[in-house]
Amino acid sequence: MSNQLNTMDIKEILKFLPHRYPFLLIDRVLDFTPGETLHAIKNVTINEPFFQGHFPVQPVMPGVLILEAMAQATGLLAFKTMSEEPSNDALYYFAGIDKARFKRVVEPGDQLHFEVQMIKERRGIGVFTGVAKVDGEIVCSAEIMCARREISK
């Protein structure tokens, strides 16, 4: 049995996600098992553009962006699960969210750890659970759906 981790650096992430600055919210994938789980990180710095207005005196990462980062992690897991190479023909879209809960704020200097798990997939729609943590403490949890859709040309 191998202990080798399946990782993704930023170059590989850029091949799978269409997002670019300032909306690419996954920095590295630490490990994944297709069809099961993916662990990723986002390094949160004071240089993030959203901190200019949210909030200048007490910078806090918007919760919707934590959820978006979690959705990006599920998109990566979906691609890896379906053994699909990225193309200009299809994308995995954020399709739904349930049971989103926020437990604490995320501030500059924090490192967000995302753990997403595939629950089921049927006809191009995947259902996932996700947890975001900082220093082992849960920041956010949610159930996320993403859907594979052809891109019209």
UniProtKB/Swiss-Prot annotation:
The keyword Lipid biosynthesis applies. GO terms for molecular function: (3R)-hydroxyacyl-[acyl-carrier-protein] dehydratase activity. The active site is at 54. GO terms for biological process: fatty acid biosynthetic process; lipid A biosynthetic process. Gene3D superfamilies: Hotdog Thioesterase. It is found in: Cytoplasm. Its main location: cytoplasm. This is 3-hydroxyacyl-[acyl-carrier-protein] dehydratase FabZ. It comes from Shewanella halifaxensis (strain HAW-EB4). The gene is fabZ.
